[in-house]
Amino acid sequence: MRLKALFFLAWLITSLPTAAQLSRAQFSSLENILGEKSSFSGHMTGFILYDLDSQKVVYEKNSQLNFIPASTTKLFTLFAAVAILQDSTQTLRYVASGDTLKIWGAGDPSWKYQDFFQPDFEKVWKNYQVIQYSDANQVSPAFGYGWQWDDYYYDYSAERSPLPIYGNLLEVKKVGNRPEVFPSRFQKSISTTTLPIKELERDLHTNDFKYSPTTFLGRERFIPLLTSGQLTAELAQELTGKTWIYKKESLPENNQAFRGAPVFPLLQEMMLESDNFIAEQMLWMVSDHLFQTLDTERAIEYIQKTYFFDLPDQPKWVDGSGLSRHNLFTPRSMVVLIDKLYRIVPEDQLYALLPTGGKTGTLKNTFQAAQPYIFAKSGSMSNHYSLAGLVRTKSGKTYAFAFMNSNFLGRPSAIRAEVEKVMALVREVL
């Protein structure tokens, strides 16, 4: 990690003259496409372009204003994970007690989630038949601060938990004219309804499910489970064949840490596919590494005081994923973050982590060009769209940028199309 010599960027961002490196023609081109007669005039827009070589701002517009970042929040989470976790996940903490192994989850999201490399749990519990599981180290709740309660039903809003299994999701498929679910233990929790619902739906407060035989479409999908320590123990017992007991017990000081899977594939999924669940669990692993508790707020506070004290504007940062509308960042703080990532993450890894326009991840179908030129994280929710990362121009230079839009009417896709026009212009004229 090359974390030193990164803490004068705030002064550079706030004190250097705007557009110091642009010709009159270049400046006019950007002013015209972003000005009062442009598609951006009807809502709040912030934009900044930063020369990574000279460390100068070359253009900015409203870069001092706060915006809801949505999933560009994951850039902050990425930095935290790279700085603290380094190469592997925090998986478990454990102590032996006679013939029983007592364990506490450390936030690792990888157990039976997608096709990720699996931690070698047998190293920890192979000599024990009884495992006592506790979640007493969990401080933050399952739902993040400011998340919308009625998103509980959607897979992008899976609950956080200390030792997730299956990503805390229920897989749903259609067999005949009825739903079939995995884990199959929940099949008995499905009942029918006369309400004309089109998919399997979960009760808000329980893991009970309903569907309508007459209107069921049965698209393959995932539904978040209502998590609990008891459910974790029951699922783990089915998977391991060992006896699991759930008992809430404080984590003792003499515990040992077990670090499990490689962290890079998880970071890639978080960034390329904008996986909210992984992002949230990343901050819990950071918290476990630092404090041996699962506390999002405390982890964020530590990262901000240790690594982000020099940002031009202190962000209001409340979760790992960007699901919360309480997150507020300025574009000029975003480019300082991009610069930090650019300098501490090896170049090949950084470009593998950032979605590439026309090639990978959430930007696969946008910013298409013969030679990729956008490497960035996007973020969107109703009335908000942001993009932050790196742009490579035809002159061969690479710039950091942040482009944030808030309070617009209509679909984010319309704003995204206009953002693409601006970035294509940047590519051409700089």
Role assignments for model-derived ranges:
Residues 67-81:
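Active/ligand-binding-proximal structured segments within catalytic/core domains
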Residues 53-55, 65-68, 107-111, 137-140, ...:
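Solvent-exposed loop/turn segments at secondary-structure junctions
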Residues 1-26:
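Bacterial Sec-dependent N-terminal signal peptides
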Residues 21-53, 57-66, 85-88, 124-129:
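Beta-lactamase-like hydrolase cores
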Residues 47-49, 93-95, 388:
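Short beta-strand scaffold segments in enzyme catalytic cores
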Residues 83-313, 429:
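Conserved serine DD-peptidase/penicillin-binding transpeptidase domain
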Residues 58-60, 258, 283-430:
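Small-residue-rich helix-loop
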